[in-house]
Amino acid sequence: MSERKEGDSGAGVRSAVITQTKPKTQKPAMYRVLLLNDDYTPMEFVVYVLEQFFNKSREDATRIMLHVHQHGVGVCGVYTYEVAETKVAQVVDTARRHQHPLQCTMEKD
C-alpha cells in the first residue's frame, strides 16, 4: 500500500482550502482648506469665494470671512487631498484673475 500525503484525497488529486480575506480599506486622509488674511482683498470678494467654491450660505461665508479678518486665518472646509487641492487652486486662480493677493492653503487635518 502506498503512503498518503497530507492533502491527497487518495485519487492522486490534491485539495487545498482557500480562505478569502477581506481587504481593509482605510478612510482617506482629510485636509483643511485655509484662507489667509491680507490687507488688500475686499471682504466682499472673500464672501464671494466662500459662496462660490465652498457652497457656503451668505451668513456662513460672512462669519468665516470675519474670522479670517480678525484672526488672520480661517477654515473654509475639510476635504480629501484631491478635492482640497482643487479648491485651493480654484481660489488662488480666481483671486489672481481679479488681481487680489488672497492666499489659500491646505494642511492635514
Swiss-Prot record:
Pfam families in UniProt: ClpS
Subunit (UniProt): Binds to the N-terminal domain of the chaperone ClpA.
Gene3D superfamilies, per the entry: 3.30.1390.10
Cited NCBIfam families: PRK00033.1-2 (NF000669), PRK00033.1-5 (NF000672)
Disordered as annotated region, ranges: 1-25
Family as reported in the entry's similarity comment: Belongs to the ClpS family.
Name of the protein described by the UniProt record: ATP-dependent Clp protease adapter protein ClpS
Species the sequence originates in: Phenylobacterium zucineum (strain HLK1)
Annotated function: Involved in the modulation of the specificity of the ClpAP-mediated ATP-dependent protein degradation.
InterPro entries, sorted: ClpS, ClpS_core, Ribosomal_bL12_C/ClpS-like
Top-level taxonomy: Bacteria, Pseudomonadati, Pseudomonadota, Alphaproteobacteria, Caulobacterales
PANTHER family assigned to the protein according to its UniProt record, in alphabetical order: ATP-DEPENDENT CLP PROTEASE ADAPTER PROTEIN CLPS (PTHR33473:SF19), ATP-DEPENDENT CLP PROTEASE ADAPTER PROTEIN CLPS1, CHLOROPLASTIC (PTHR33473)
Recorded name of the encoding gene: clpS
GO BP of this protein: protein catabolic process; proteolysis
